[in-house]
Design a protein with these regions (language model features):
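A mid-sequence, solvent-exposed acidic-amphipathic segment
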Residues: 4-7, 17-19
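A structural motif detector for beta-strand N-caps
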Residues: 12, 18-20, 24-26, 30-32, ...
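C-terminal segments of enzyme domains that contribute to small-molecule binding surfaces
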Residues: 79-84, 89-92, 98, 115-181
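A generic structural signal for short, non-catalytic loop/turn and secondary-structure boundary residues
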Residues: 7, 65, 137-139
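A generic local secondary-structure boundary/capping motif
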Residues: 6-9, 132-134
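Sequence-level motif detector for i,i+2 pairs with an aromatic at +2
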Residues: 9, 15, 139-141
Length: 181
């Protein structure tokens, strides 16, 4: 059933009542836009923008943005339970991106048109290596995007803007052996 049939949360904007299920939790300041969906046992822990889908067992932090058609999915276990997943504060999931069975920390970016699962191979450009996405599960400050010339999604540590001496420049080079043929 719809959440708003039973309770109307204060300080929350819901564009389409049918898109928020009873049992969802929405913190004050949250916006669920027309294409957004929040299932039962899912929600926001601070003001957030949801234009994608939060499935059961998923929470997002303050300032998180789920852009159009993005999803965070916690698949059901054989006993029917869903492991809890969390997307950190100020994390952005790009248009048509999906994060399955993996948590992300604060200040992360998942670029558009990506499907990231724990066993998805990522290219870590900063140290020129391949590794599964599970190696950064729950960590803060990652950008994962498609980059021209790379087969795998490219993961880069986001520059810490709070520390002094950071040049703010990113290393956009890629190994020639990793380039798409």
């Amino acid at each position: 059933p719809r959440m708003v049939d039973y309770v109307v949360p204060t300080g929350v904007r819901i564009a389409e009542a049918e898109r928020v299920r009873l049992g969802a939790y929405l913190a004050s300041g949250t916006e669920v836009l027309r294409e957004g969906f929040v299932s039962y046992n899912a929600g926001t822990l601070g003001p957030a923008t949801v234009e994608g889908c939060l499935y059961s067992g998923v929470t997002v932090g303050e300032g998180a943005v789920l852009q159009h058609d993005s999803s965070v999915v916690s698949n059901a276990l054989s006993n029917g339970d869903r492991p809890a997943l969390h997307v950190g504060a100020s994390t952005v999931l790009g248009v048509n991106s999906t994060l399955m069975e993996l948590s992300l920390g604060d200040n992360c970016l998942l670029g558009p048109n990506l499907l990231i699962e724990p066993d998805t191979t990522l290219y870590f450009a900063d140290d020129d290596r391949l590794a599964p996405a599970s190696t950064i599960a729950g960590e803060d400050g990652w950008s994962i995007v498609h980059e021209p010339g790379n087969v795998e999604p490219v993961a880069r540590k986001v520059a810490d803007t709070t520390s002094t001496g950071s040049s703010g420049q990113s290393n956009q080079g890629s190994r020639s052996s990793r380039r798409a043929k």
